Design a protein with these regions (language model features):
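Transmembrane alpha-helical segments and their cytosolic interface motifs
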Residues: 344-394
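Short, charge-rich amphipathic alpha-helical segments embedded
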Residues: 321-348
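Juxtamembrane "helix exit" motif at the C-terminal ends of alpha-helical transmembrane segments
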Residues: 383-406, 460-462
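Tandem repeat scaffolds
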Residues: 2-323, 330
């Protein structure tokens, strides 16, 4: 019996343990709100000092009753329409509070907790909200213009048409958030997480999204023109109708995406992981962004990524286009290096880069880097005419039964053409006479053999495609 009595006393002592002392700052705030008689709180430039104050739903609910400072419908502190700009809310707990249309511009609210709060049309412009928690908030049209939101959490928040232009969002977490129509123009959002978020029709133009994570997010008709998506993760993202014009997708993960309805004009792809990603070369325009900006070495890497992707989806013609552009970027880069070496009076560099430029330029003219049959036909025609002219100049082609050289254009062209396409000098009643003429015949025959082999290689490429 004594043991039971002792146990009951212990339980009673635990249940009657006093709550933490009520913060007098909180009491003063509640009294001030009640004195407004239903009107929004106006501080007239006098900021609140509520650092580490507990204004949470759980703390105030036992005291609320029908108090004027309590939002009975939402079960939280009622600060709707409050003018509390510049207030100190660092580490304050405002979970469940009603802050609809409240003005908190310039507030200091680092590590504050706004979870489950109503912040529709609230103004947090230029506020310091680093590490703050906005988990599950309802915040349509909330304004975070130029706010500091580093490492802030907006998980599962409803922030349709929210404004976050030029805000600092490094490390922020928007996983599962509804951000339909939100504006992030010019924001800095390195390492920000948007996993599974709804970002339809969002404005992310000129936003820094380096290392951002969009895995599984919906970006239908999103505007990402000029955004920096270096090393961003977009696996499983939905990008129907998105505008990626001029976007920097260098080293981004773009595996098995459907970009066929996206605008990709002058986008950058150097080092991007593209595999099974569906889009057409025409969507990029005449050149990738690196080439437009004169960054030929990076453009070469960009076209390589495109070439490999087009191969992976079986689009061989477009893979050939990307290959040719890649080779051309190599030539242009060699030209830039040649000019730099010339300016620096680097003879070795001049010879090395000059030779590379000339070799690439010749191969481009000859067969467009192994992709053009028409250019090979042109090379054949040019060489036939050139050698026919040389044969005429040397006067070394003598018709059989005649001691005089022929200068007939038909004789010269027919002999030159047959000599280009046969292994031995043609037997058409004309004999080459003289050392120079025989040397020309040999050189032309060897050149013809090389061109015929190249013709077979290019033809094989075309047949495979």
């Amino acid at each position: 019996m004594d043991r039971l009595v002792t146990r009951d006393r212990r339980i009673g002592a635990v249940n009657s343990r006093p709550q933490p002392p009520f913060d007098p700052r909180v009491g003063a705030l509640l009294a001030e709100i009640a004195a407004q008689d239903g009107a929004p709180l106006r501080r007239d430039g006098r900021p609140l000092d509520l650092r580490a104050a507990d204004l949470s739903r759980a703390r105030l609910a036992p005291l609320a009753g029908d108090a004027a400072w309590w939002d009975a419908e939402r079960q939280g502190l009622n600060l709707a329409g409050a003018e509390i700009a510049g207030s100190d809310l660092e580490q304050a707990d405002l979970t469940g509070a009603t802050l609809k249309r409240a003005r908190l511009t310039g507030a200091m609210a680092r590590s504050a907790d706004f979870s489950a709060a109503l912040i529709e049309e609230a103004d947090f412009g230029k506020a310091d909200l680093s590490g703050a928690r906005f988990t599950g908030v309802t915040g349509g049209q909330a304004d975070f213009t130029e706010a500091m939101l580093e490492d802030a959490s907006f998980r599962d928040a409803a922030l349709r048409f929210a404004r976050l232009p030029r805000s600092l969002l490094d490390g922020a977490d928007f996983s599962g958030a509804d951000l339909w129509g939100a504006d992030f123009t010019g924001a800095d959002a390195d390492y920000t997480r948007f996993r599974g978020a709804r970002l339809d029709e969002v404005n992310l133009c000129d936003t820094n999204l380096t290392h951002a994570d969009f895995e599984g997010a919906s970006l239908t008709k999103a505007r990402l023109a000029g955004s920096r998506l270096r090393s961003a993760k977009l696996s499983g993202a939905k990008l129907d109708g998105a505008d990626l014009s001029g976007a920097d997708l260098s080293a981004a993960t773009l595996v098995r995406l459907d970009l066929s309805s996206c605008s990709l004009r002058h986008a950058r792809f150097a080092g991007a992981w593209l595999n099974g990603t569906r889009f057409r070369a025409a969507q990029i325009g005449e050149a990738v962004g690196e080439e437009v900006d004169g960054e030929y070495e990076a453009a070469k890497a960009s076209y390589l990524a495109l070439e490999q992707n087009f191969e992976s989806i079986g689009s061989r013609d477009e893979a050939g286009w990307a290959y040719r552009r890649r080779r051309r970027m190599g030539r242009l880069h060699a030209g830039v290096q040649f000019h730099e070496a010339w300016r620096d009076r680097d003879r070795g560099g001049v010879l090395r880069h000059g030779y590379r430029w000339l070799a690439d330029r010749f191969v481009e003219w000859l067969c467009d880097y192994g992709e053009s049959l028409s250019r090979l036909f042109r090379a054949f025609a040019v060489l036939i005419v050139v050698f026919a002219g040389l044969f005429g100049l040397t006067g070394g082609l003598i018709p059989e039964g005649s001691g005089a050289p022929t200068y007939n254009a038909l004789d010269l062209l027919s002999y030159s053409a047959l000599n280009m396409m046969t292994a031995n000098p043609p037997e058409i009643g004309i004999k080459p006479v003289g050392r120079v003429t025989n040397l020309l015949v040999g050189v032309q025959g060897g050149t013809g053999i090389v061109l015929m082999g190249l013709f077979g290689f290019v033809l094989g490429n075309r047949l495979r495609r």
